[in-house]
Amino acid sequence: MGFLTAVTQGLVRGADRMSKWTSKRGPRTFTKSRGAKKTGFYTNRKFVQIKEMVPEFVVPDLTGFKLKPYVNYRAPAGIDTPLTAKALFLETVAPAIEKDFKEGTFDANNLEKYGFEPTQEGKLFQLYPKNFPR
C-alpha cells in the first residue's frame, strides 16, 4: 500500500506530467518518433518492413511548370474580398440573363430557369424567415 500511496501523492502533488515521453519513461514497445506511422514491425530485435505499409507519394509531372515551390516571407498578403450576394449573382446568373436578353429569349415570368425559387416550402433550411432559435 505504501508504494501506491507514494505514486498517487507524486502525481497529485505535481510530478512532471507534462515532460517529454521518452524511452526512459515509456514501455519497451515505445519508439521515439515524430508522429510518422511505422512501416513494419519488430521480431526478435529485427525490423521487418511491410511493403503495403510504406507510403507512396504521387507527384504530378511538373515539366514546363513556371511557378517555383517557394513563397518569399516578405511577399505581400493576398487580398480576399468577402463573397456577397451581389458578387455571387454577377458571377453565376448574370451572364446567362444577359445572353438571353440579347438574344430576345428572356422571360421575366420564367426565372426558375436561372435558379430562382419563388417559395422556400419543403426546404430544410429556409432563407426567409430566419429559422434559428432566439
Swiss-Prot record:
<comment type="subunit">
    <text>Component of the mitochondrial ribosome large subunit (39S) which comprises a 16S rRNA and about 50 distinct proteins. Interacts with BCL2. Was also identified in the 28S mitochondrial ribosome.</text>
</comment>
<dbReference type="InterPro" id="IPR019189">
    <property type="entry name" value="Ribosomal_mL41"/>
</dbReference>
<keyword id="KW-0689">Ribosomal protein</keyword>
<dbReference type="GO" id="GO:1990904">
    <property type="term" value="C:ribonucleoprotein complex"/>
</dbReference>
<dbReference type="GO" id="GO:0006412">
    <property type="term" value="P:translation"/>
</dbReference>
<keyword id="KW-0496">Mitochondrion</keyword>
<keyword id="KW-0053">Apoptosis</keyword>
<keyword id="KW-0809">Transit peptide</keyword>
<protein>
    <recommendedName>
        <fullName>Large ribosomal subunit protein mL41</fullName>
    </recommendedName>
</protein>
<feature type="transit peptide" description="Mitochondrion">
    <location>
        <begin position="1"/>
        <end position="13"/>
    </location>
</feature>
<keyword id="KW-0687">Ribonucleoprotein</keyword>
<dbReference type="GO" id="GO:0005762">
    <property type="term" value="C:mitochondrial large ribosomal subunit"/>
</dbReference>
<comment type="similarity">
    <text>Belongs to the mitochondrion-specific ribosomal protein mL41 family.</text>
</comment>
<comment type="function">
    <text>Component of the mitochondrial ribosome large subunit. Also involved in apoptosis and cell cycle. Enhances p53/TP53 stability, thereby contributing to p53/TP53-induced apoptosis in response to growth-inhibitory condition. Enhances p53/TP53 translocation to the mitochondria. Has the ability to arrest the cell cycle at the G1 phase, possibly by stabilizing the CDKN1A and CDKN1B (p27Kip1) proteins.</text>
</comment>
<keyword id="KW-0131">Cell cycle</keyword>
<dbReference type="Pfam" id="PF09809">
    <property type="entry name" value="MRP-L27"/>
</dbReference>
<dbReference type="GO" id="GO:0006915">
    <property type="term" value="P:apoptotic process"/>
</dbReference>
<dbReference type="GO" id="GO:0003735">
    <property type="term" value="F:structural constituent of ribosome"/>
</dbReference>
